[in-house]
């Protein structure tokens, strides 16, 4: 097995003997270039609004050995091993979307990796099976061969379109335009609201299953390989909705908004408010996502998410699959955006980047290489947290500021303290 050390003198982070909270930083100028030569005195770090004393500071180099930036000290420093997890979310990605990304990913693995890159491929298949290569490897052929066996979810778009049609039929949207029977209208609206919750809960379970798998993968890698430094995760997905099932709920919302107050009262929706008044109101799904992010940050994972749907699209029904819901342009835009929000959130909160609304996947992989070439690392002593907060999986928010004006800092937003 190859040397798994990611850098000298890194303190213990969230191990059995917890000592230090480590924060990896990407610090860039206005043009997006990494800023070298900074010191610990030029940063401030806060946890839950309280300033923490910086007790550890380092610069880590993951660029290729022959990279020259003009800083003698950095140029002479050895390159650390860079550990990359390629994760393909086969539950939320259709075969068409996966085949759109796969050639570019295959080319990057075959030709674009550096000598100090170690890669592991993990994938969650539509039937719930997980597959992964045995270890982090520099043998690109092993990873490429495994990539060719990854599958997308053939049922996803068909099932959602089928459910949207069923919901439309339950509310009479395909054949009923309103004939003044308020009791019948209320019954249809009530049935639609109930059905939308059933479909939304199914979608939430699906999304949660994918998040649980990712957490299990992180735990497995942590126990098996003991990589001390940051782990880069390139996550390919057809969407990770922040509010699972938003498309179903908005179908009911729009129908309810057109109903009279009396019909809404008969349907049990007497004072109409959208079932989803604003993004982020689905607290259960939000907790799932925030808890997952906190765990990833605890274990030092940085996510770069790739939206495989390329230029737009969503998990809402599609005319190709026999049905497309008659949503307003505003609601359809909210549905499409919702599918991206989980990917945006997981990348931003772990200090990485999200790539979406683009078919230029080759450029995305090149940007990941560039973005992970150098990192600042700062640390502070783990505060004593309330046991109740630990038991409740509280997300402890962290913010890093620079005292030098004009710098852009990207860092993880917080972590979950497991108390171990």
Indicate residue ranges for each PLM-predicted region.
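Scaffold/interface architecture of coatomer-like assemblies
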Residues: 1-420
């Amino acid at each position: 097995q190859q040397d798994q050390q990611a850098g000298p003198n890194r303190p213990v982070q969230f191990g059995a003997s917890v000592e230090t909270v480590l924060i990896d930083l990407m610090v860039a100028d206005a043009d997006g270039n990494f800023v070298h030569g900074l010191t610990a005195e030029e940063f401030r770090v806060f946890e839950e609004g309280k300033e923490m004393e910086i007790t550890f500071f380092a610069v880590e180099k993951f660029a290729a050995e022959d990279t020259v930036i003009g800083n003698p000290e950095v140029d002479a420093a050895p390159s650390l091993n860079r550990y990359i997890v390629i994760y393909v979310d086969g539950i939320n990605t259709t075969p068409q979307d996966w085949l759109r990304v796969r050639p570019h990913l295959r080319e990057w693995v075959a030709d674009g990796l550096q000598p100090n890159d170690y890669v592991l491929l993990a994938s969650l298949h539509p039937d719930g099976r997980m597959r992964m290569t045995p270890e982090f490897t520099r043998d690109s052929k092993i990873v490429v061969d495994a990539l060719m066996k990854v599958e997308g979810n053939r049922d996803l778009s068909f099932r959602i379109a089928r459910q949207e049609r069923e919901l439309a039929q339950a509310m009479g949207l395909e054949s009923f335009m309103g004939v003044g029977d308020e009791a019948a209208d209320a019954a249809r609206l009530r049935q639609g609201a109930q059905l939308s919750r059933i479909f939304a809960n199914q979608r939430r379970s699906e999304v949660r299953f994918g998040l649980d798998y990712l957490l299990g993968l992180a735990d497995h890698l942590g126990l098996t390989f003991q990589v001390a430094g940051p782990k880069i995760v390139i996550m390919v997905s057809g969407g990770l909705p922040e509010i699972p099932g938003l498309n179903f709920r908005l179908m009911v919302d729009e129908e309810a908004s057109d109903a009279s107050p009396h019909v809404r009262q008969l349907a049990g929706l007497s004072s109409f408010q959208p079932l989803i008044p604003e993004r982020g109101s689905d607290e259960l799904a939000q907790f799932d996502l925030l808890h997952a992010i906190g765990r990833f940050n605890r274990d030092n994972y940085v996510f770069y998410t790739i939206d495989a749907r390329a230029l737009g699209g969503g998990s809402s029904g599609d005319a190709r699959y026999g049905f497309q819901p008659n949503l307003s342009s505003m609601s359809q835009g909210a549905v499409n955006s919702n599918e991206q929000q989980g990917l945006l959130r997981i990348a931003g909160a772990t200090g990485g980047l999200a790539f979406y609304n683009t078919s230029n996947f080759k450029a995305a992989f090149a940007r990941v290489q560039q973005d992970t070439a150098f990192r600042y690392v700062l640390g502070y002593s783990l505060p004593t947290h309330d046991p109740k907060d630990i038991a409740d999986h509280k997300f402890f928010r962290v913010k890093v500021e620079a005292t030098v004006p004009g710098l852009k800092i990207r860092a993880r937003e917080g972590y979950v303290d497991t108390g171990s």
